């Protein structure tokens, strides 16, 4: 068994497609890994307490819990809509406060944390490994805890427990307050996996510093090891070369994307790019990926129609070899090569109506997690298709044209 953790969103608003990219990327990776029997235990978090949530609750005259539950539910709904397999654990910070307090207590007991005016800070000066994840010039880089700069012993020290009476708070041995963001993730990993080191830590590229750096150093303090064997960072989605973000108001909400382009278009988009490099999108690129997604769905349905009609036995050994090849590409994040392989099979299928190619395509689309692949072609669909072919052969074009439109609506042609 291997262990993977992927940082989740801060649930203060509806997620946009930039928020969905990391979880979609690792969904594809895990589908490949699981197929070749490399089993991962997958932990994903939801940051459901944060200054942004408190601010939103105040503006809308709601509680922090009402805001976080609303947008947590929305995010979980989007996982389903985008056909993303649910992680083994989805943990909310607010469900784990006592555990996080205990974790901070361990760091204080170890001498890695110090207390100032009721807040607890991590002492980065004790660990020369600090900076090893980001490789940044720490003399020029601060972590952004400006509210605490007059309390910290060192500019790079970060808050483990924040003393405050603003928003939702909890009692701790040090003060009334709430945990720091950087300690929430490392505490969850330590608690759920109970391992000194996990195999993969994933998330957006913007989390390298300070978040991943600060997660990592806490694990080094407690266990003497880097938190993860591999740190994998997913590139941003940009709108016409500008980072997509709520603050810039240049984002596409996850549900709006589905309404305009379809859920499988997003999976197609991710498969057409490198996982670690930024994607710059615009209307033309999204429409192009929508066409590719539609082509894949039509191909899937036509391949199923052929399989339903055929009495020939399928070559299951060759199909299995093909799927193992695709799975290994997924596991290695070589997504663009998968599109090349799919298009080769589509070309073969279309040129000679090849049954083996049809079977490979059907199973491949299922492996890749396209939502359309969960919908089977029915006998009624096959009857409609065969009727269209008969009418077309008999040159009853008025009838065949009408049937063609029905088939097209069902994405069978």
UniProtKB/Swiss-Prot annotation:
Q: Which InterPro entries match?
A: Cys-tRNA-ligase, Cys-tRNA/MSH_ligase, Rossmann-like_a/b/a_fold, tRNA-synt_1_cat_dom
**Reaction(s) the record says it catalyses:** tRNA(Cys) + L-cysteine + ATP = L-cysteinyl-tRNA(Cys) + AMP + diphosphate
Instruction: Report a single Gene Ontology molecular function.
Output: zinc ion binding
Q: Does the keyword Protein biosynthesis apply?
A: yes
Q: What note does UniProt attach to the cofactor annotation? A: Binds 1 zinc ion per subunit.
Cite a GO CC annotation. Answer: cytosol
What Enzyme Commission number(s) does the record list for this chain?
A: 6.1.1.16
Signal peptide annotation: none
Do the record's keywords include Cytoplasm?
A: yes
* Major subcellular site: cytoplasm
Annotated motif 'HIGH' region, positions: 9-19
Q: Which UniProt keywords apply?
A: Aminoacyl-tRNA synthetase, ATP-binding, Cytoplasm, Ligase, Metal-binding, Nucleotide-binding, Protein biosynthesis, Zinc
Quaternary structure annotation from Swiss-Prot or TrEMBL:
Monomer.
Q: What is this protein called?
A: Cysteine--tRNA ligase
Q: Tell me what organism the protein belongs to.
A: Mycoplasma mobile (strain ATCC 43663 / 163K / NCTC 11711)
Gene transcribed to yield this protein: cysS
């Amino acid at each position: 068994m291997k262990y993977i953790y992927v940082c989740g969103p801060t649930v203060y608003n509806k997620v946009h497609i930039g928020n969905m990219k990391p979880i979609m990327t690792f969904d594809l990776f895990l589908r490949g890994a699981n197929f070749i029997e490399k089993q991962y235990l997958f932990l994903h978090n939801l940051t459901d307490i944060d200054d942004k949530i408190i601010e939103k609750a105040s503006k809308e005259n709601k509680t922090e819990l009402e805001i976080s539950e609303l947008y947590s539910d929305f995010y979980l709904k989007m996982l389903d809509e985008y056909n993303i397999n649910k992680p083994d654990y989805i943990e909310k910070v607010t469900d784990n406060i006592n555990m996080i307090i205990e974790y901070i207590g361990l760091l204080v007991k170890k001498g890695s944390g110090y207390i100032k005016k009721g807040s607890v800070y991590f002492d980065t000066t004790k660990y020369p490994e600090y900076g090893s994840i980001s490789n940044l010039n720490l003399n020029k880089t601060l972590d952004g805890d400006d509210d605490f700069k007059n309390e910290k012993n060192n500019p790079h020290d970060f808050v483990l427990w924040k003393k405050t009476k603003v928003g939702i708070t909890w009692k701790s041995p040090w003060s009334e307050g709430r945990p720091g963001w950087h300690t929430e993730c490392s505490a969850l990993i330590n608690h759920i996996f109970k391992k000194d080191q996990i195999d993969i830590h994933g998330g957006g590229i913007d989390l390298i510093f300070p978040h991943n750096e600060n997660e990592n150093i806490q694990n080094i303090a407690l266990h003497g090891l880097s938190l993860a064997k591999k740190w994998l960072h997913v590139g941003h989605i940009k709108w016409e070369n500008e980072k997509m973000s709520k603050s810039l108001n240049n984002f596409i909400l996850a549900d709006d994307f589905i309404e305009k382009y379809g859920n499988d278009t997003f999976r197609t988009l991710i498969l057409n790019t490198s996982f670690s490099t930024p994607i710059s999108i615009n209307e033309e690129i999204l429409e192009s990926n929508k066409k590719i997604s539609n082509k894949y769905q039509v191909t899937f349905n036509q391949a199923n129609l052929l399989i339903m009609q055929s009495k020939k036995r399928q070559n299951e050994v060759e199909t299995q070899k093909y799927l193992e090849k695709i799975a290994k590409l997924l596991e290695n994040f070589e997504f663009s090569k998968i599109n090349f392989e799919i298009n080769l099979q589509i070309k073969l299928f279309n040129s000679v109506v090849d049954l083996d190619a049809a079977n490979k395509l059907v199973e491949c689309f299922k492996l890749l997690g396209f939502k359309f692949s969960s919908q089977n072609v029915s006998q009624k669909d096959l009857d409609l298709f065969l009727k269209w072919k008969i009418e077309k052969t008999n040159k009853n074009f008025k009838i065949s044209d009408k049937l063609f439109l029905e088939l097209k609506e069902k994405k069978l042609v």
